[in-house]
Design a protein with these regions (language model features):
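N-terminal assembly/attachment segments of tailed bacteriophage virion structural proteins
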Residues: 1-117
């Protein structure tokens, strides 16, 4: 059975969420990102225990704060990065967790698509 791009991302950007701080996973290569990607990039988050039993949503923003469509994370802590976010040289990611009587946001982290420049 053939899989579509929506079923398989070819590249995953990995992040670590410790309490309210989101940061790039130091074992993940964030270099060589090219502006204009569609259906290729996913974000995946690993969470500390404060996030247990929360519905988790990733927020995506332009460098000047414009909000792109938020994405609910799946059971692996992953989501596709919205096409609109990937049209600019840089974008920001923030994560939110919610359960009854509980809400936890993170900081925003900026991702730069360096166009393959070294």
């Amino acid at each position: 059975k053939n899989k579509t791009n929506k079923e398989i991302a070819l590249r995953t950007l990995k992040f670590i969420v410790d309490r309210q701080i989101v940061k790039k996973d130091p074992t993940c290569d964030f270099s060589g990102l090219i502006v204009g990607t569609v259906g290729y990039l996913k974000a995946q988050f690993v969470f500390s225990k404060e996030w247990n039993n929360c519905v988790k949503v990733a927020g995506f923003y332009s460098a000047n704060g414009e909000e792109y469509p938020p994405q609910v994370l799946d059971e692996t802590g992953s989501c596709y990065i919205p096409e609109k976010a990937l049209k600019k040289r840089s974008f920001k990611i923030q994560v939110f967790g919610k359960r009854e009587g509980y809400f936890i946001p993170t900081n925003k982290i900026e991702i730069t698509q360096d166009g393959g420049r070294i």
